[in-house]
Amino acid sequence: MYTSGYANRSSSFPTTTHNAARTATENAAAGLVSEVVYHEDQPMMAQLLLLPLLRQLGQQSRWQLWLTPQQKLSREWVQSSGLPLTKVMQISQLAPRHTLESMIRALRTGNYSVVIGWMTEELTEEEHASLVEAAKVGNAVGFIMRPVRAHALSRRQHSGLKIHSNLYH
């Protein structure tokens, strides 16, 4: 079978393209602060949504900071999730009133690729703007995790986009 020399040549194009795409994604995400509202009894959904991004951010040389209210991250879970164990920092037992202030300070430093904090209440526009500004300064991403009880979600009207997938139909 004959193949042309063009087809057999090695090229750095795919690697260059991959690196450029990764850099573009990291730069586009920097300064992003997003709130993830999830059912208290279904935390796996939030994990499924965030883990791919957290894995990608884990390729940076910076830390990932988890500000958790009570639970301590399991070493086994971090490793099995594909997150870099050597780059994950956690501060647990943080009072909710200190989480926002801690997130702002951590995002602003630039030492973290991502800062994840748990909040029980919705943020005001001013609080959200402070987080966004800090994330821009630190070239970082912030995630506000807000667990809600199932009945709390059914009481309020949500505006949003429904994403339909043929994957499940």
Curated annotation (Swiss-Prot):
Keyword tags: Cell cycle, Cell division, DNA damage, Septation, SOS response
Sequence segments annotated as region (FtsZ binding): 106-112
Region annotated Lon protease binding, chain positions: 162-169
Protein name (record): Cell division inhibitor SulA
Family statement: Belongs to the SulA family.
Modification comment: Is rapidly cleaved and degraded by the Lon protease once DNA damage is repaired.
Gene encoding the protein: sulA
Assembly: Interacts with FtsZ.
Keyword Plastid: no
Site (Essential for degradation by Lon protease) residue list: H169
Expression induction or repression: By DNA damage, as part of the SOS response.
